[in-house]
Amino acid sequence: MTPLLELKDIRRSYPAGDEQVEVLKGITLDIYAGEMVAIVGASGSGKSTLMNILGCLDKATSGTYRVAGQDVATLDADALAQLRREHFGFIFQRYHLLSHLTAEQNVEVPAVYAGLERKQRLLRAQELLQRLGLEDRTEYYPAQLSGGQQQRVSIARALMNGGQVILADEPTGALDSHSCEQVMAILHQLRDRGHTVIIVTHDPQVAAQAERVIEIRDGEIVRNPPAIEKVNVAGGTEPVVNTASGWRQFVSGFNEALTMAWRALAANKMRTLLTMLGIIIGIASVVSIVVVGDAAKQMVLADIRSIGTNTIDVYPGKDFGDDDPQYQQALKYDDLIAIQKQPWVASATPAVSQNLRLRYNNVDVAASANGVSGDYFNVYGMTFSEGNTFNQEQLNGRAQVVVLDSNTRRQLFPHKADVVGEVILVGNMPARVIGVAEEKQSMFGSSKVLRVWLPYSTMSGRVMGQSWLNSITVRVKEGFDSAEAEQQLTRLLSLRHGKKDFFTWNMDGVLKTVEKTTRTLQLFMTLVAVISLVVGGIGVMNIMLVSVTERTREIGIRMAVGARASDVLQQFLIEAVLVCLVGGALGITLSLLIAFTLQLFLPGWEIGFSPLALLLAFLCSTVTGILFGWLPARNAARLDPVDALARE
């Protein structure tokens, strides 16, 4: 008969300072299918180390160990996990049940890593618990069960995937005599059903119930009777749960990891909330700064556009503040006509201006009088609350008409409901009011200077008596590059004048400068907010490292029942990501509240959340969870199952 478990010259040593301490010294042992074997020995004899090697939790330093003819030394970590999952079931002295899971959920754990569907897992767990007399305790937590009941749950867990080989480490060590008898009776039943039962104990009475007692002393076998040739197997073996395909196993493991992550968060609500707080503040800061910053930028740009966009202003002289007399008459009406003929010009509006006194009845105020064309108001985004702008007939005829701004209207006509048709004095020239222009409210504030507008022909011919222009505003056609238009305009006037006695001011250049400046400021503020997100991520990493330390034994249990290192990595990584995702969702909610509050105090701001901003926030949460959860998850996955099980 071929042995099920075959050990040849197994040695196991551990480093102790500069030396190696040999715990197992050339163990040679054969165990056959269906046997009930007891391994006995005093504390420190090496029996627990031997059990760990038998259960593929540990590897021998030298020697050969075969399971069903397969040399375990040739297997990688995942293959060893599969071997434990499909062939071995562990029963521990201290039960090693997961305290936050019910009895039924504890029994299900091995099948989770085998990729068994939830419905099948549930039925199998209920069947095993019913067989072991715990059908009325399926929803109980370990703390609600007696020691004997916990050990029976442990046995059911060992049988979940079939449990061809049952490894029982001091299964009765923490039980009273009655519970001890119950557990031993169950082990005998398992042996009768065809399971190979290996009991590690120091109790002679427990060992005496085995068919074969192997004694180990100081790492060497001192008694090893031959195996019984015929093993009585009354019933069939347990149905073996085969490992599912890679995809099914991944999906099952992912769902279980997600469920376990949620339970872990719910078990420590205050700590979880405090951990999330950093993520909440970080995400809320990033989203709020992006959204509110964008609203502020749009407000600034809207104010600039209200002044007039896609326009180029032409002034006489070398630059602002140049009052050299030789340049004052640089711009002529012929220049205006030449500019209007260019194919890239939508309109060209001249301007002449002078500070004058305005009088109506007994009201006398100072104002800025501006001679413009009818297109001026459209170029600068102005609307009319009363009346309208000049028409071409009024421009050609130098009509004595005037448009007031709203401030001038209030000064001259504080009690009149309609001022169109009223006559005022502009300087010494009577002029009929034909409209009241409303300038767009700007976040930069309004000018305190009273302003009126007359036809440029009237202003230059009747009021000022000059033949030159103070400035020309050129509106560029849509789709034409403003910078190129500015170059062509400069070239045109330079050729006409024979020199460059003027300068230009491009509003689009100002707009681009403002856009660049606001974008830079927004980026800087976002980077500051990202720092708070990083701090929150470090908090997540810290708590996850603490969690790994606190749950070391749980990790060992999961590895013992068949979890791979990748399963453990996935478990803790999902927990970190879940913390960050929930924190991210709360952070977005907080940023919405901040935005709505600001909207109440700043009604002119258009604060909106684009789907892209929300998507980026969730991506930030996920990436934060992955980045800062990777190290703790990797540490958990690298734990040695034997060391993990030994920790309290």
UniProtKB/Swiss-Prot annotation:
Keyword ATP-binding found: yes
Keywords, comma-separated and alphabetical: Antibiotic resistance, ATP-binding, Cell inner membrane, Cell membrane, Membrane, Nucleotide-binding, Translocase, Transmembrane, Transmembrane helix, Transport
Location within or outside the cell: Cell inner membrane
InterPro entries for this protein: AAA+_ATPase (IPR003593), ABC3_permease_C (IPR003838), ABC_transporter-like_ATP-bd (IPR003439), ABC_transporter-like_CS (IPR017871), MacB-like_ATP-bd (IPR017911), MacB_PCD (IPR025857), Macrolide_Exporter_MacB (IPR050250), P-loop_NTPase (IPR027417)
Similarity comment: family membership: Belongs to the ABC transporter superfamily. Macrolide exporter (TC 3.A.1.122) family.
Transmembrane segments: 273-293, 523-543, 576-596, 611-631
Protein name as annotated: Macrolide export ATP-binding/permease protein MacB
Gene: macB
